[in-house]
Swiss-Prot record:
Disulfide bonds join 34-60, 43-64, 47-59, 53-68. Its main location: secreted. Expressed by the venom gland. Damages membranes of susceptible bacteria. Has no hemolytic activity. Not toxic to mice. Does not inhibit the proteinases elastase and cathepsin G. GO terms for biological process: antibacterial humoral response; innate immune response; venom-mediated disruption of cell wall in another organism. This is Textwaprin-a.
Amino acid sequence: MSSGGLLLLLGLLTLWAELTPVSGQDRPKKPGLCPPRPQKPPCVKECKNDWSCPGQQKCCSYGCIDECRDPIFVN
């Protein structure tokens, strides 16, 4: 294989390794809504999605704040 082909293969392997796995992205969200935004320092990243939070907690996004919170339920 030529050096150009090897570089292309190496580049593609690097891109593939950097991709985020999609295994948990098609799960449904947990029930309930996120409560109002808390008063916290900016840009706190506690979670990536509902399933990275314990129990019934949801991953709530408030701008650059992502944190696990107990859900609220609206009738």
